């Protein structure tokens, strides 16, 4: 089987590519100015080819924060109901978000996710399924293992810390808080042919927890040991 080409090789329009770059530049200014985002682990990101990026979910800013943490273009999933709310719906559609059913069971979303992974792109998912109620890593839902198995791409674990302090679920608007992102070593399914889905779920959970602990410790050092 031929190796997947880098994501930049695919035929998005010039307008689409320029819009993505503009939004990335704008969001980067926001993230650096308001959230002092710091990222560790760039060396773990595959230089080319598809990868499934799995991250914890602390707040509504997470897709932006993870997207900015990678130098390659990032695809992300969004509930189909969000596309009906203008201007948010138009914005996420313009950024090539993949619509999924509210319960995450839609075949069209799964097929599009697999298509983008197999053509060599990065796709971000939040396997916890919803935002954390207290900022900690919640139990992962097993659905992402199907995507990983069918695509055969590496799984890249990522952890965010500080998003919960910036915008917890019970707060209407975001606030200022330093953000730390930790990118972990990719999990290669080609080396785990004898691992079943339950064991894979445990492995991914352990790797994400390791990343989360590193991100939390690094953020605490930046904040003088305080959670702010």
Where do the PLM segments sit?
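Residue-level "edge-of-site" marker
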Residues: 43, 105, 161
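Hydrophobic alpha-helical segments typical of transmembrane helices
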Residues: 18, 22, 26, 62-65, ...
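A transmembrane-helix-recognition feature enriched in membrane-embedded lipid enzymes
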Residues: 2-41, 47, 72, 85-95
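Short, basic, glycine/proline-bearing loop/turn elements
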Residues: 26-28, 94-100, 127-131
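Non-catalytic C-terminal accessory region of glycerolipid acyltransferases
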Residues: 1-18, 108-228
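Catalytic core of membrane glycerolipid acyltransferases/transacylases, capturing the structured
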Residues: 32-33, 45-104, 112
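A generic secondary-structure micro-motif detector
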Residues: 16-20, 77-78, 102-103, 133-134
């Amino acid at each position: 089987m031929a190796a997947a080409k880098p994501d930049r090789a695919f035929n998005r329009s010039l307008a689409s590519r320029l819009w993505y770059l503009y939004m990335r530049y704008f969001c980067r200014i926001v993230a650096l100015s308001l959230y002092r985002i710091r990222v560790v682990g760039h060396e773990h990101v595959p230089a080319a080819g598809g990868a499934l990026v799995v991250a914890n979910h602390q707040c509504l800013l997470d897709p932006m924060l993870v997207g900015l943490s990678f130098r390659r273009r990032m695809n992300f999933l969004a509930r189909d109901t969000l596309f009906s709310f203008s201007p948010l719906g138009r914005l996420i559609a313009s950024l090539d978000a993949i619509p999924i059913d509210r319960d995450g069971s839609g075949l069209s979303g799964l097929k599009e996710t697999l298509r983008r992974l197999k053509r060599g792109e990065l796709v971000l998912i939040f396997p916890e399924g919803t935002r954390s109620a207290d900022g900690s890593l919640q139990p992962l839902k097993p659905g992402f293992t199907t995507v990983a198995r069918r695509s055969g791409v590496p799984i890249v674990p990522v952890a965010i810390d500080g998003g919960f302090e910036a915008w917890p679920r019970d707060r209407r608007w975001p606030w200022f808080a330093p953000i730390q992102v930790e990118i972990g070593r990719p999990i290669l399914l080609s080396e785990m042919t004898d691992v079943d889905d339950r064991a894979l779920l445990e492995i991914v959970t352990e790797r994400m927890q390791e990343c989360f602990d590193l991100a939390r410790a690094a953020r605490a050092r930046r904040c003088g040991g305080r959670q702010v």
